[in-house]
Amino acid sequence: MDYSIADRQMSIMDKLGILTDAAKYDVACTSSGNERKGDGTGMGNTIKAGICHSFSGDGRCISLLKILFTNECIYDCKYCVNRCSNDVPRASFTPDEVCRLTIEFYRRNYIEGLFLSSGILYSPDYTMELLYQTLYKLRREYNFQGYIHVKAIPGANQELVRMTGFLADRMSTVSYTHLRAHETR
């Protein structure tokens, strides 16, 4: 099935800024807990979004590109910054854009893997299919062997979730019951 996303005349860097910032609220990765901004005289900025840290099974700390596929969502969950009633800038990647970003960050040694989550675009199945396409392309077309943590989309077809899970090193989810309990529509 061809799932294409309309081009909204937004650069990939603009999308990256919006979708890394929106992903920072997902607690699946760790951060330093420090909120020291870069002052322009030195290096580093601990509050900049985009790179998070996780730990491998053997205890190593690994850097991940932490992004949302989209921050658009059909739901209006009270707890979520990306709820449809929230007035925030919206953006969506294509599977190829996520692949290219991941590969470029990996080649530059900025990351060792990808953390990919998403708002729900059109329907849970539609969004899960886009995540599957992204991981499939990363693994098969781009031969990416780095670490991938993906968030399963609540309410998506279980076969889509299963197929996506085979391409990821780790998969997690928000329970569908939790999601529905916080809806306001």
Q: What are these model-derived regions, one by one?
A:
Residues 1-72:
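Flexible, acidic/Gly-rich N-terminal and inter-domain linker regions that tether
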Residues 65, 114, 148-150, 171-173:
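Hydrophobic faces of well-ordered beta-strands that scaffold small-molecule active sites
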Residues 65-67, 96-107:
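Short, charged beta->alpha transition segments
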Residues 67-96:
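Canonical Radical SAM [4Fe-4S] cluster-binding loop centered on the CxxxCxxC motif
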Residues 87-99, 125-130, 137-170:
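Canonical radical SAM enzyme core domain
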Residues 114-133:
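Conserved glycine-rich "GG(E/T)P / GGGxP" loop and the immediately following alpha-helix
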Residues 119-121, 151-155, 176:
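Active-site beta-loop-alpha junctions enriched in small/polar residues
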Residues 177-185:
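Conserved small/polar residues in nucleotide/adenosyl-binding loops
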